[in-house]
Amino acid sequence: MKTCVITGAARTAVGAYLGSLKTVEAQDLCAAAIVEAAKRSDIELGELDEVIMGDVYGYTPNVSRCAALVAGVPEEIPAYVVDRQCASSLQAVVSACQQIMSEEADVVMAGGVEVMSRLPFYLDPSARYAPFRLGDKPLFDTFNHGVTMVSSKKYPGLNMGLTAENVAEKYGITREELDAFAEDSQRKMAEAQ
């Protein structure tokens, strides 16, 4: 069985919600990261066997494919998206490793993309089969309403951010402890390179 290694990484700037990146399409941000990760790994985009990206809200159909094409990945190289909520980009990396270890691929670009400021609003599903006649109909915010639709009926309305806050409160985890854990994680990543 082949061994899977991460040869390089890149990320784009992180902006505030509805901030300076609000007009940038997800595929354009992702394409920039693909190009830079390939450069840091000293690989040509044509060497890729697959591109896999995690994307939770997915307003661009197969944003992985769109980003790959924008980045200059040859069109014969396939790409797909995984959605595992907050672990989507991690699942993309796991899926890439699985392909390499099973000898389905040699070189895979994997990561994630999300542009929260570009999330669409949507209509109540009944609008599809009961067209509007008279009266107002609500719009739903994808982030506020859509994310809670995947939650269990037992815990309605809890997205990952609220869940993290509840867990921190329940177990007495301080912000300083979280920051120290994050710093240690970054240190380990730097040492591993």
Each model region followed by its residue ranges:
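Acyl-thioester C-C bond-transforming condensing/cleaving domain
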Residues: 1-2, 17-46, 61-62, 68-69, ...
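Conserved PLP-binding active-site segment in aminotransferase class I/II-type PLP enzymes
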Residues: 3-8
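Short polar catalytic/cofactor-binding loops
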Residues: 9-14
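Short glycine-rich phosphate-binding loop at a beta-alpha junction
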Residues: 47-54
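Glycine-rich phosphate-binding loops at beta-strand->alpha-helix junctions
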Residues: 55-60
